[in-house]
Amino acid sequence: MHWELRVLQQRLERLSAHHPEAWAPPIDVYETEKAFIVTAELPGLNRDQIELAFEDRRLTIRGHRSDRSASGDVLRFHQVERGHGSFVRSFEFADKIEVEHVAADLVDGVLTITLPKVPPAPSRKIEVL
């Protein structure tokens, strides 16, 4: 059921992305043995336009790309394909995350977030008394 809800959420996000006022950046989420990695294409955004939060195993990415006509210049667009405005994307992780070691880096318009997993507790032998 959780998977079905995620698929539905992705479909809704794609539909809203085709609305001229909506913008949702493409994001990949993958997993290694030790961490989850999230990459988001955010061309034209700087660090001040991106907000990250992690709470209750949920990563939330918020951002805002300004409308190019907000500069005050009169612009006559011939074609507009790049969206603008605010976006919010959230991702929930099943494994526990070492929140104090989460790292984010923005290079060439690609945001990379590394979320290290909490290592499993070592097994121990329990003596029967």
Label the predicted regions:
Residues 87-89:
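Short strand-edge motifs at loop-to-beta-strand transitions and within beta-strands
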Residues 46-52, 92-122:
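Beta-rich strand-turn-strand
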